[in-house]
Amino acid sequence: SEGIPKGVELTGDNILGNAQQIANIINVNEDDTIVGSLPLFHAFGIVVTTYMPLIEGIKCVAHPDPTDGLGVAKLVSKYKATIMCGTSTFFRLYTKNQKIHPLMFESLRLIVAGAEKLREDVRVEFKKRFGKEIFEGYGATETSPVASCNLPDKVAPDFSIQIGHKMGTVGMPIPGTKIKIVDPQTFKELGINEEGMILISGIQVMRGYLKNEEKTKQVLKVINGKTYYITGDKGKIDEDGFVTIVDRYSRFAKLGGEMISLGAIEDKISKLIELKEDSLIDFIVTSIEDEKKGEKIVLLISHVENEYILELKEKILKNFENKLMIPSEIKIVQDIPKLGSGKKDFNASKILAK
C-alpha cells in the first residue's frame, strides 16, 4: 500500500506455524465453516482462509469477489458459515447493501477484520445492522500475516471472565508471539502505554525479502537471540497487554515542527461524517509538499456534493482543537484509490492529491 512492492519469503514453518497459531486462538472445530472470499494473492486470504482450513480439516466455502456483499451473504446463509474474515473496506460495503438481511449472517460466530485499520463508523454500523461484532487483528505479510487479534470474551474454568478484546486496539499478541514497543532510534524497550516502534518476533516472521539483502537487514533485527521484524508502525501496549496502533511512521506530516498523524485526522473525520444507510461516501487523508509549510494536509473524499463539503468544513473547524490537523484542502474525487486486497492505496492517493 506504500513504497515499491517487495517479494516476501515465507517458509513452510512460517505459514504452518501461523496457521496453527490462528486455529488455536479461534478454537476451530469440526462444525466450523470459514468463508474464503479474500484474494489469494494476499497473505490474509491465502493463509487464514485457505491454508488454515485445509490444515485443520474444516470446511471452506469460496466466493470470487469480496466486494459482492450479497453474494458473500448468500454463501454464509446457504452453508451456515461460522467464521468470516475481511477488511474494513469490504465490511463497509456490506453495511451499505440493503439487500443483505441480518438473518443471512446469523450463523457467524466470529468476524475478523485485518489488512487495514477497522474504521469505528464501520464497526458501529455493522453491529447496528447485523447484530454482530467485528474483532480487529493486526499483522503484515512479513508476519505470515497474523501477529495479534481481538477475540470474544469467554468464561474461564474458574468461572472468571477472560477479557479477549478492547475496542480501539488490535488485541493481544497471539500465542508464540512477542511484541515489543521500542524507541525507533535507540531500540530501547519502552514502558506501558508509551508510544514507539512496534517490533514482532515469532515463528511467523519471514525469512527476508526476495533478492534484497539490504532491505532485509533494515527490517530484521536480532535482540537477545530473537529475530524481530521492524514494522514501521507506531503503537503502544497497555497494562493488560493489548496493542494499539497509532499510525504508520510514514503516515505523519510535519507541520510547524509538529508531527501530525494522518490516521488520527481520519479517525476524527470519520466521527464527523454522518453516513446514511445508502451512502457511498469514502475518504482518505494524505500529505503533499508545500512551498510555504514544507507539507500540507489534503482530504480526498468521494460521492459527495459541494454543499456537503461546506458543511464538513464547518464541522472540522468547530471540532478540531489542534488547528494543524485541519486539512488545507478538500478535494472531491470520483473514487478513493484501492489495491486489489481492499487496502487504500496511499501512493496513488498522494499522486491524486497533487
Functional labels for PLM-detected ranges:
Residues 16-33, 41-82, 97:
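Conserved AMP-binding/adenylation subdomain of ANL enzymes
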